[in-house]
Amino acid sequence: MKIIPLADRVLVKTDKSETKTASGIIIPDTAQEKMQSGTVIAVGSDSEKIKVSVGQRVMHDKYAGNPVKIDGEEHLLLKGADILAVIE
């Protein structure tokens, strides 16, 4: 499936949260912390408002975006304003 964001939206593939602690204890899905970072997969057509490009790693607001599953992997469809920083 291919998703093309519109306007000032950005499609981000979210980073996976840790499933095990350093000591080897498995963390259940319900207790895993929601990740606030990911990789930009696609950028909407209103690109002059969005200061990120495909392939960059970004941090985003914790409760922002609409979750989307693409080929079994978690993604978020975010507004450009919900991106807080670029990770270098």
From Swiss-Prot:
Q: What are its GO biological-process terms? A: chaperone cofactor-dependent protein refolding
Instruction: Provide this UniProt record's keywords sorted from A to Z.
Output: Chaperone, Cytoplasm
User: Where does the record place it?
Assistant: Cytoplasm
Top-level taxon in the UniProt lineage: Bacteria
Q: Which GO terms describe its cellular component?
A: cytoplasm
Q: Does the UniProt entry include the keyword Zinc-finger?
A: no
* Chief location: cytoplasm
* Record bears the keyword Transport: no
| UniProt-recorded Gene Ontology molecular function terms | ATP binding; metal ion binding; protein folding chaperone; protein-folding chaperone binding; unfolded protein binding
Disulfide-linked positions: none
Record-linked InterPro entries:
Chaperonin_GroES (IPR020818), Chaperonin_GroES_sf (IPR037124), Chaprnonin_Cpn10_CS (IPR018369), GroES-like_sf (IPR011032)
Give the function comment from the record: Together with the chaperonin GroEL, plays an essential role in assisting protein folding. The GroEL-GroES system forms a nano-cage that allows encapsulation of the non-native substrate proteins and provides a physical environment optimized to promote and accelerate protein folding. GroES binds to the apical surface of the GroEL ring, thereby capping the opening of the GroEL channel.
Similarity remark: Belongs to the GroES chaperonin family.
The record's subunit annotation is:
Heptamer of 7 subunits arranged in a ring. Interacts with the chaperonin GroEL.
Name this protein carries in UniProt: Co-chaperonin GroES
